[in-house]
Amino acid sequence: MNKLIYYFGNNGSDGNASMNNILGNKGAGLAEMSNLKLPIPNGFTITTELCNYFYKHNNNFPKNFQNELQQAISKLEVTTGKIFGSTTSNPLLLSVRSGSTVSMPGMMDTILNLGMNNEVCNALADACGNKLFALDSYRRFLEMYGSTVLSIPSDLFEQIYENHKIQADIYKDSDITVELLEKIIDDFKRLHIKYDKQLINDPYEQLESAIKAVLYSWKNNRAIIYRKLNNISEDFGTAINIQEMVFGNLGKTSATGVAFTRSPSTGEKKLFGEFLINAQGEDIVSGTRTPMPIIANDSNSMQAMMPEVFKELSQIAKKLEEHYLDMQDIEFTIENNKLYILQTRTAKRTAIAAINIAVQMVKEKLISKEQALMRIDPESLNQLLHTRIDYSKGLTSIAEGLPASPGAATGIVVFSPYDAEKLSHHHKVILVRHDTSPEDINGMHVSSGILTIRGGMTSHAAVVARGMGKPCVCGTNNLSIDEQKQILIAGDIVIKQGDIITIDGGSGKIFLGEMPLIQPTFSEESKLILDWADEISSLKVRANAETVNDALVSIKFGAQGIGLCRSEHMFFDKNKIPLVREMIIAPDIERRQCALQKLLPLQTEDFKSLFRVMKNKPVNIRLLDPPLHEFLPTTEEDKKNLANSLNLPLSMIHQRLHAMHEVNPMLGHRGCRLGICLPEIYQMQIEAIFTAIFELHKKEHIESNLELMIPLISNVAEIKKLKMYIYEVVQELEQRYSYKFSFTLGTMIELPRAALESKKIAKEVDYFSFGTNDLTQTTYGISRDDIASFLPYYLEEKIFESDPFTTLDEEGVGELIEIAIKRGKSSNANLKLGACGEHAGNPTSIAFFHKANLNYVSCSPYRIPIARIAAAQAKIKQGS
């Protein structure tokens, strides 16, 4: 078996920072600090290989491990001049800490002051001349060992401790006496015996039990949950770091604390942190005492109280940051005015701090732009783009669903789009529905947030909300709506229309009442790092947008064009929907043409507004795609209004609606099939688009950059048929206006057959745009609106590694995309390639699109900054 124990300390180290995989983060950091000659407590690291062996061999150690451990302790005794378990001279006490290869703060176990018993406690008191300190250390050991190794509930120790303080009329820990500590220790021992039938006094037995406890903690519930949430492998295992104890609880010249080399909240370049005098590390973490700042303008700071130690800590912090070239999180102890560094690691930080620090370090010439970009978590930019809940206030949610669209919103509950529109004039509203449909668009538009009982991360509500930049929570199966009573039920809680709730689209949590919110910020540093991303990336980022507001937001966030304009979204405007319904219900082509002619000028103005804002940036307009039933009324009141407006009997409306019913409309009469069977619809749209282009050119001297896209192709014959229709209309308009139009023609590749037939299809078009939402649906045979009913189980059982509608399935859907690219390029070398599904805003999927040599991705406006960073990171990682 490989070497299991690596030494570190004042005499150097067996390891270094590059050995993270076997020494863990903490052990590698201690080894590196030893090599930098920094003051650290001497010790050794037991490698992650022991953890893996332990779990593979029925929780047993390798044969020679105990001998190696005793040799390591002997070496530590020589180095420190202290004896482990000594009852006559200065005894060696140990700390035993976990150390995963990936930082998992607070998830695994630690034992301090190990090696204590009655005789060792007396020897320690004699050696330092401080019995109160020795007893305090013994008390701490019994509590930590009892709760960690023996699984005694920690609150039982806390109760004993607090009861003794109350009986002695003592309220501050600093006033505790030797006599009181002796009573507390006696009760702690009795608690050990009650749970374990014995008191473990042998230091080596304590050490072996502590090592096992740390190994067991690798698979405790909180560690398992943390790894799942953060995608950390179970196979890494944990290292164990064993060090001589240094004591921050020796009196007024001793302390413990945590320091950051820069502010983890803002990134400001100054030492930031807290410390406690006469304390050990768990006192800061537990919150039982209020720590003091390291730097402050008053006498309670370390800078004022311990100026020499503060100066040394500042120098070490600077040295560590310059060595690791990143902000550091440093744990330290001060023993009788001597500073010891216990740990350094890359510090966690907010999104704004990450950006500010990255920009600062480039300007300080510590790192390159590429390194700066790799420091940014693309998803963390959601913090900058959306309002979020201030969780520091300690809040309790009433329910939880899927985090479908980030941001937080507070408002009164409404149950219909009509009520949302009516009440939004005077209140912020949260639209609560079983699910949403395109008909709800106006209600969604005026709502501050959207909550649906059904649906997943790519449901209609989720997709539209992300496009609008509105918070949305979907799939809240622990909520129910009683539509007759107009109430929302969460367990025993009944929420009526008009009651206030808060939703968090970033976590999926729902709260009763108004929660404290933090407003978003977008700094100059944020803009600068996004500019660096654009300099580096080869993959362009466009927006999915069809309104002027969408387009303006997209430009603000750096979109290089519109990659998907869903023209049908324009039809849901309240001024247009009656005409659209009239066109659909019309019993003959003459009446349909009449309705289309009324729609024509309205569509023309829509397109003019979009082209005007985009100013010659590419605008990719998809012709009408969804099935027509989505535009039709669902309530009796709306059906009556439609009948009256068309001067038709209500029975005929019902008859037409029944005739248009489809069992599976998403695979039915939609997309290019509509354009072929009802060519007058596409002809109206084409006339509106090209008329808008001509009028902007002639009247406003604005040139447009049109890309025209045909949806849901499965057969090259469909392209040929629609291409003929399109060019007939364009040629007629060119003659009418005496103007030559310039545009490119493309198609969506969103059906497996289209991907397989792409060689033929590519000959007829200028570009492909991969519609990965429908391509995923039709490849898997899974409805994105219904996946929420089984996805959690599939993820838990590892049937799916991730939600295929969030992260692109590279093996199945990805292979179809690669086939389409290869075959398409073989017949059309100049074929341009884009992607416009929800995956186009997902960093992992963007890495795939970069590798596949796409020209652009197109995502919802509020995903654009995330996509820009992810595109640059993909280029940096893949080196091309």
From Swiss-Prot:
E.C. designation(s): 2.7.9.1
Region entry C-terminal, spans: 539-880
Residue span of region Linker 1: 349-405
Family of this protein: Belongs to the PEP-utilizing enzyme family.
Stored NCBIfam families: PRK05878.1, pyru_phos_dikin
Domain notes: The N-terminal domain contains the ATP/Pi active site, the central domain the pyrophosphate/phosphate carrier histidine, and the C-terminal domain the pyruvate active site.
Name this protein carries in UniProt: Pyruvate, phosphate dikinase
The encoding gene: ppdK
